[in-house]
Amino acid sequence: MTETGIVQRPWGWFETIGAGEGYLVKRLCIEAGHRLSLQRHRHRLEHWVVVSGSGQLECEGSTIHAEAGTTLLVPHGAVHRAAATTENLLIVEVQRGEHLSEDDIERLADDYERMKC
C-alpha cells in the first residue's frame, strides 16, 4: 500500500505524487544539513531529478554535485544516498520495479540509527 500525503522523516519529508502498475513517483525534500541513509533496493530502480536546492548525490562510490536539473539513475542493488548542503534539496523520484514499498530499503549506514539488526 502506498502512503499518501506528506510523510515526515528525520531528514525531511516525502510524498507520493503518482503511481501505476510498475511505477511510483515521489517528491522528496531533504532539509539543509541532512542526508538519506546509505541504502540499496533489491526490487526497484530509481531515477532522481533534482528540481531545486543543492547538495550531493552518491551512487556506487561516485559523488556528484546536485542542483536543479541534475539527474541520476540508480540501478537495482546500487548503493546510494542524497544529501542537502546549505539549502533544502528537492528531488522528484521515479521508482520502477515489481515491489515498490518502503520495505525494500536495506540501510547500510544511517545518521538517525534506523538500521535493522
Write out the residue ranges for each language-model feature:
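Short acidic-glycine-tyrosine-enriched beta hairpin
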Residues: G61-V79
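A generic "binding-loop/recognition-motif" signal
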Residues: H34, H43-R44, S62, A78, ...
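Double-stranded beta-helix
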Residues: T2-R9, R81, T85-C117
